UniProtKB/Swiss-Prot annotation:
Catalytic activities: L-glutamate + NH4(+) + ATP = L-glutamine + ADP + phosphate + H(+)
Organism classification: Bacteria, Bacillati, Cyanobacteriota, Cyanophyceae, Oscillatoriophycideae
Keyword Metal-binding attributed: yes
Gene from which this protein is expressed: glnA
The name this protein goes by in its record: Glutamine synthetase
Quaternary context: Oligomer of 12 subunits arranged in the form of two hexagons.
InterPro entries: Gln_synth/guanido_kin_cat_dom, Gln_synth_cat_dom, Gln_synth_gly_rich_site
Coiled coil region boundaries: none
Main location: cytoplasm
Species: Trichodesmium thiebautii
Residues binding L-glutamate, per UniProt: N60, G61, R117
This enzyme's EC code(s): 6.3.1.2
Length: 119
């Protein structure tokens, strides 16, 4: 389900579409369906849709950011009384992401175009 959408700062008709959260596997399936629908609707209108991070040289890139949260028994375990209002679990979670950032790049930034967006 879509929560909201808006035109992005860049040119060439870039848009941001915010989707509602779901469990990891369900959200992965929903994203695949979403991309399939967007590609086919664009094609039906003689247009092209791309999800490339940097489709145009010299223009702003796009990214697919993902918000992450973990709950236990309906309670957000990231909320707490440590640094920045976070829990100890959240701080360890962030530390794990930082520690393994290079390995995470293998699937998070899977193409050369992902890095062009950062430059």
């Amino acid at each position: 389900p879509i929560e909201k959408h808006h035109h992005e700062v860049a040119t060439a008709g870039q848009n941001e579409i915010a989707c509602q959260f779901n469990t990891l596997v369900k959200k992965a399936d929903e994203i695949q369906v979403y991309k399939y629908v967007v590609h086919n609707v664009a094609h039906a209108y003689g247009q092209t849709a791309t999800f490339m991070p940097k489709p145009l040289v010299g223009d702003n890139g796009s990214g697919m950011h993902c918000h992450q949260s973990i709950s236990k028994d309906g309670v957000n375990i990231f909320a707490g009384d440590k640094y920045a209002g976070l829990s100890e679990e959240a701080l360890y979670y962030i530390g794990g992401i930082i520690k393994h950032a290079r390995a995470i790049n293998a699937f998070r930034n899977a193409s050369t175009n992902s890095y062009k967006r950062l430059s």
